[in-house]
Amino acid sequence: MSREEQIKKLNQYLDNRELAFRAKDGDKNIFHTESQLDSSLKKNTAFMKRCKSSLTSENYDSFIKEIKTLSLKKFIPEITAAIVEGMMKCKATKDILSSVKIVWALNLRFSTAFTGPMLANLYCALYPNPGYSLCHESYFELKQNENEVSEKDRSSHLLKVRPLLRFLIEFWLNGVVGTPEDFVSYLPSTDSNDKKFRKPWFEEQNLKKPLVVLLFNDLMDTRFGFLLLPVLTSLVRTFSCELFTTEDFEDKETLELVNRLNPVVWRTYLRKSLNSYVDKLEVYCQKRKSLFEELNKQYQEQSIIRADPNNEKFQRLANFSKSIESEFSSYASLSEVLNRKASEDLLELNFMEKASSGTNSVFNASGERSESANVETAQVWDDREQYFFYEVFPNFNEGSIAEMKSSIYESSQEGIRSSSENNKKEDDLKDSTGDLNTTQVSSRVDNFLLKLPSMVSLELTNEMALEFYDLNTKASRNRLIKALCTIPRTSSFLVPYYVRLARILSQLSSEFSTSLVDHARHSFKRMIHRKAKHEYDTRLLIVRYISELTKFQLMPFHMVFECYKLCINEFTPFDLEVLALLLESCGRFLLRYPETKLQMQSFLEAIQKKKLASALASQDQLVLENALHFVNPPKRGIIVSKKKSLKEEFLYDLIQIRLKDDNVFPTLLLLRKFDWKDDYQILYNTIMEVWNIKYNSLNALARLLSALYKFHPEFCIHVIDDTLESLFSAVNNSDHVEKQKRLAQARFISELCVIHMLDVRAITNFLFHLLPLEKFESFLTMKASTLTNINNDMFRLRLIVVVLQTCGPSIIRSKTKKTMLTYLLAYQCYFLIQPEMPLDMLYEFEDVIGYVRPSMKVYMHYEEARNALTERLQAISDDWEEDDTRPVFQGANDGDISSNEESVYLPEDISDESETDEESSGLEESDLLDSEDEDIDNEMQLSRELDEEFERLTNESLLTRMHEKNPGFDVPLPLRASSLGSPYVTRNEESASESSHVMFTLLTKRGNKQRSQYLEIPSHSSLVRSTKNQQTEEIMERKRVKEMVLNFE
């Protein structure tokens, strides 16, 4: 209110008071009425009804006109009751002022005859019980568990008390009432015999006091708390000039009018009483603040522990925060009226906004984090860059903003040094600022929103926040909030910067944090409800919003855990994917943050139990395990990195990185240049780490090792033996932890088999070794096997698939064809007996059988595969020639393959394919078959040697035979009967019978004539011995081939 309006108001009060006093003294010429007053019953009754229901500012003129024209004298008692009832219905200020003027006009006409009963009725309406204060507990219904008044009861009581008190104060200022003596005689009886009223209305010393002083004393009664604090605050604000002005007021004219209206004594008394009341209110507000913080912390902890927020408690807490905010605002207003400094702790309302909106962090008024909070979160972040991004924010106070503006301006003017140029730039800056002030705010906001997608750094975010500081209006805030909530689904990388901007601007208004939290929460619930209808980019964007709001501590922790709980309720693949994204985004933060550490640990344990109890697919299980490992990786010791020498680095780059199919020969040339005596161990370690080589480059490594065999055979044999030994050891010990390494080794030995660097028998033995003994027993006895370790079975099956995919066709075309056919049936039984296999392994199973043996049927049921295997084994058993009681699957010694002589399962039909007949004419074979006392191992050894030799002869490639030298044309030698008394054969037999010499025919040619002559060569010469051995071997070979063809099934 301006000074002129205030002076006019005070003069009006003084004029009305003077007229009221004159009317009280009996002056009848103050209020002029019509000479002929209307005494119509109908009009007078209508006036009474209108006083009861239509006492408003719109009807003021009609009321004044009727007061001047109607008699109304006979109806004064009814009018007093009706007008009090009408005043109780007035709520608006203009209606109250109009009603005061109407009552003041009636007071001028009828004086005490109307005023006394009217004031008595009004006072009785305000005080139903004369001995009780306005804030007595009898006016409210207190809760049973809490000493608090319900909001409904409090609001209804305030709506009733506020207008009545306003009427009485206005009546006092206008002179309608002065002290209780004016109406005390009209009050109901308070005799001690009356059970209803046991105390008098007023004490004798209070009858002489102004009614306003008594009313304010009653309002400032703190015996029953501060329930009427809003009423007192509104009245003090409204009548601060009339009732609480001090003597040192600057405006002397106003002070003089106030002194005439309200004496200094009573103003001083009211200020003193109000000052005492504010002191008590300050202590009360401090207690309420502590109680609020305690309840807030308690509710937050309970919601975090249960991962299920209690909405009723948080709604009650929100209402509690609103009441505290109202009390603190009233405290600040009363302190301002009394010109006293209010407590800074009570003036800070940000903490209540954060608590009501669910903010977890505690910041001071400038937005800085407290030192205790800094200590608690010191170990939350991985590096200082994350700490500064999520924990350090600019302050929006005058000093910091001026400093930031000056730093930005200096950075833009970095190249300018001279003072004159600096002054010119400052003038330009001022001019541009003036121009900007003339620009419409909407266009500036448009430009600001267009620059949001380019905000991709911490510095740009701070600058954008500072720029918005000058655009802080309700409309601009709403537009910015809408832009922050509508990020394109393919631009999830902008979410951290957008949320940081909202965190900085939350110092200006809590709308930024609450709006983003509500948007993210509703979007997440809608996404979980719709399941797979959302695209991956949309899911990632929503989860990123939740995570960033959690890291900036804008979203309450109980809401975050509520999102986690929604993901594990149904535990579908969609929920698992969302849960994994949440864990990877903010799971580590929640696990490290002190307030949520225990809850997050219990939540991770619940996820582990749910995972074990659910039959998850391998892909879903892998995704969830990776997320859990990312959140809480196992503790490991510090890995000391071994410093490699220059040669080791060169070999690592040469073999494990650059080795490909097209550079095997250059690599071989470089390796040959090494000193193989001094660098033997380095070369061995590098080549043995086959898992460090690219999986597609293992073929090149096998070819490289085959080429090295010509120069360093011992080294190559050492590498192959150790690789096989490592594989056998891993299979026997069920060491499938480093399964990727074992798969690489299996691929490596398979590539060696393809290029004939490794014998087929070694691969076959390894394949049979991958089928465990208990499985074969179950196949033979036709009983279902007991699965003890499904992970071990899956590891073995994957090794089998790798080997068959790499060298399966090569093995099936070798001498082990029948063995491999039997093995493929056993492999199908082994695979189909598993209870449940992943889809990828099922597809590999179907593909590998068709790749190795296209004509073989792929069985999909265990019973069919078992019957086929049984028939196959029965046919082999019937065809066995040596021992009908011998088992079909028998352990074979693998000493010729690996140095540790591992036991493998080798079908004996391999020997049956290459076994020769007893009637062979070869000397060694006939001796072997005729010696019954010889050991069975020697027989198997010799049979194996014959099989290997036969394989060498039959598997020679056409390319190798093309490069061999063609033998000379064998023509029959001419016979000379005149010089030889016996035919050629006879002479040859005679010469062969001689022990000292052997006859050879030498064929020569001169011109077109051939000539022959005989030579006697000593029998001990190398030519004679090699010729005899060659003839013997050819005879034996022809007989073996003939017998095998005859015995072929």
From Swiss-Prot:
A GO cellular-component term linked to this record: cytoplasm
Localization per Swiss-Prot or TrEMBL: Cytoplasm
List of residues that carry Phosphotyrosine: 60
Ranges annotated as biased composition (Polar residues): 412-421
Keyword vocabulary terms for this entry: Cytoplasm, Phosphoprotein, Repeat
Biased composition (Basic and acidic residues): 422-433
GO biological process, one term: nuclear-transcribed mRNA catabolic process, nonsense-mediated decay
GO molecular function: RNA binding
Region feature Disordered, mapped onto this chain: 412-438, 909-934
Recorded coiled-coil stretches: none
Domain MIF4G: start-end pairs: 41-282, 446-634, 649-855
Main location: cytoplasm
Protein task: Involved in nonsense-mediated decay of mRNAs containing premature stop codons. It interacts, via its C-terminus, with NAM7/UPF1. Could be involved in determining the efficiency of translational termination or reinitiation or factors involved in the initial assembly of an initiation- and termination-competent mRNP.
UniProt-recorded name of the protein: Nonsense-mediated mRNA decay protein 2
Species per Swiss-Prot/TrEMBL record: Schizosaccharomyces pombe (strain 972 / ATCC 24843) (Fission yeast)
Gene that encodes the chain: upf2
